[in-house]
Amino acid sequence: MFWSRIAGIYDLIENIYNGKANRQTTDYVASLMGKDDSVLECACGTGMFSVKIAPRVKDLTATDFSDGMLKRTSKKCRMLNNINIENGDITDLRFEDNAFDKAVAANVIHLLDDPKKAIDELKRVVKPGGQIIIPTYIHFKESTAANLFNKFGANFKRYFDENNYKDFFGKMGIENVSYHVCEGRMSCDVAVFENV
């Protein structure tokens, strides 16, 4: 699997190539957390967001379907005692309805065959009134990193810019979405909406 193969060098690529946007994005997402929040993070990758979210919340469940990525998350978060790290599929979550106050799914929507199914699952497991936070790289198609990742088998399903990212949520009937762009070589647009 592509993501397990690159797990060992993923942070290096991300920090060298896109460190500015990644720092801004992880800091912004972490700022949305509250100390009493129970948070689900899907597609946690190497724990880039996990390590910033966990210290701010009551508990964090970080999931990914790549065991290689989960090993990196475990190592990065080893000093945090309020995090549960486990294998999981964003399109088929094992959690009960209304189990979390917030859910984060960073940089994964563009990889999914059925992103609507994933968002429906996030909506199912987040309590009414809770937040769903979906950061996604924009203008990624033109980037050196996208070309490199695709060459080695990443298989991106879609590419976003500021406009079609907003259209993406509109077509799913999700309203009142706020957007926050974090600039960098691969800028990231953080979409946030309240679960209704």
Where are these regions (language model features)?
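Short glycine-centered segments of the SAM/dcSAM-binding site in methyltransferase folds
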Residues: 38, 130-131
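Class I SAM-dependent methyltransferase SAM/SAH-binding core
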Residues: 40-92
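A short SAM/SAH-binding and catalytic strip from SAM-dependent methyltransferases
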Residues: 102-114
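A short acidic, Gly/Pro-enriched loop at the edge of an enzyme's catalytic core
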Residues: 91-102
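A short glycine-rich, Lys/Arg-flanked "PGG" loop and its adjoining helix->strand segment in the class I
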Residues: 116-128
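C-terminal alpha-helical "lid/dimerization" subdomain adjacent to the S-adenosyl-L-methionine
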Residues: 13-16, 133-190
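Conserved class I S-adenosyl-L-methionine
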Residues: 1-34, 48, 72, 76, ...
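C-terminal lobe and adjacent flexible extensions of AdoMet/dcAdoMet transferase-like proteins
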Residues: 191-196
